[in-house]
Amino acid sequence: MGGWSSKPRKGMGTNLSVPNPLGFFPDHQLDPAFKANSENPDWDLNPHKDNWPDANKVGVGAFGPGFTPPHGGLLGWSPQAQGLLTTVPAAPPPASTNRQSGRQPTPFSPPLRDTHPQAMQWNSTTFLQTLQDSRVRALYLPAGGSSSGTVSPAQNTVSAISSISSKTGDPVPNMENIASGLLGHLLVLQAGFFSLTKILTIPQSLDSWWTSLNFLGGTPACPGQNSQSQISSHSPTCCPPICPGYRWMCLRRFIIFLCILLLCLIFLLVLLDYQGMLPVCPLTPGSTTTSTGPCKTCTTPAQGTSMFPSCCCTKPTDGNCTCIPIPSSWAFAKYLWGWASVRFSWLSLLVPFVQWFVGLSPTVWLSVIWMMWFWGPSLYNILRPFMPLLPTFFCLWVYI
């Protein structure tokens, strides 16, 4: 075994013309050492072998349709011998010489307003009559599974219109509206974040203004620094925690936060009172008490016309309601004054003084003019920290 010999051999494997696909017979070298490589594809060196020309053809064999058993070894070398399925593309049909034959493209249907202008009159009887036409009804009620496009006439007009309404589904969401809505939310979020950053600077600005009152005409400096604390010179509004003035800075900012919350609360109460949600009623003329009882309607109408909300008050004697048009600020001031007078009795002693001060109108006006003249140059610096709150209050006043 191992090479080819010209001497006749006897025994098993002497018929060298028999195909030897698995290499179990002599003189058929399968090992790559015997030139079974890609450089010598015809590695079966037997010159008397049967070339098995039919093996190169694709046919039906034991490996299924389109496969050919391997020849010359375990897999063979040609694509057909390796058992690969070779797909032969089918020849395309000949091109038609008559371009007019076959199905023609469907032409575009003209709009309804051009073919049936009377159908566009929805509020007239002409449309109801036109709807009986099968061609018009086919535009609204297409026949399912029918290629003719004709529809049996409706029994009545009401059922046809109801069928039209029943086939109308939910409207498709408009992407432009969705995008504009998202953009609006993003703008509101950006404006809110900008306002928040500005509002957070209010305590520091007010703290600077507060400390500047103690250093009129000079540069504010922290009085808590000394030679023993080993702290460099700094502003009293930026004291480090180890500075003795740090606790005073925290106290000032806490008071400022309370004042801001009180301002927001006052604005909210004024807004609720303006909307009529606050049960605040002034004293009814000629009476000493007032209440907001279960009276639903006013028996005595309000005198005159006023854009301010009316306050409906009841008299404990007869239970009649009296509507008095009052401004919200006046009602709110009366509410705060009544609430404070109950808890602080000493406020009643200030009433004569306030009445006397209000009666001196020339003096009051002169005092206001003098204060504006004195505080005028620095009035903007005083009110500047409250500027971010003004748009917020305005939006709440308009939209609530």
From Swiss-Prot:
InterPro entries: HBV_HBSAG
Use in biotechnology or industry: Systematic vaccination of individuals at risk of exposure to the virus has been the main method of controlling the morbidity and mortality associated with hepatitis B. The first hepatitis B vaccine was manufactured by the purification and inactivation of HBsAg obtained from the plasma of chronic hepatitis B virus carriers. The vaccine is now produced by recombinant DNA techniques and expression of the S isoform in yeast cells. The pre-S region do not seem to induce strong enough antigenic response.
Virion surface side: 2-181, 275-348, 399-400
Keyword Membrane among record annotations: yes
Residue positions bearing lipid (N-myristoyl glycine): 2
Glycosylation positions in this chain: 320
Intravirion side: 2-253, 203-253, 370-375
Region span, Pre-S2: 120-174
Record note on modification: Isoform M is N-terminally acetylated by host at a ratio of 90%, and N-glycosylated by host at the pre-S2 region. Myristoylated; this modification is essential for its interaction with the host protein SLC10A1/NTCP.
GO biological process, one term: fusion of virus membrane with host endosome membrane
Subcellular location field: Virion membrane
Record Pfam families: vMSA (PF00695)
Role according to the record: The large envelope protein exists in two topological conformations, one which is termed 'external' or Le-HBsAg and the other 'internal' or Li-HBsAg. In its external conformation the protein attaches the virus to cell receptors and thereby initiating infection. This interaction determines the species specificity and liver tropism. This attachment induces virion internalization predominantly through caveolin-mediated endocytosis. The large envelope protein also assures fusion between virion membrane and endosomal membrane. The middle envelope protein plays an important role in the budding of the virion. It is involved in the induction of budding in a nucleocapsid independent way. In this process the majority of envelope proteins bud to form subviral lipoprotein particles of 22 nm of diameter that do not contain a nucleocapsid.
Protein's name in the database: Large envelope protein
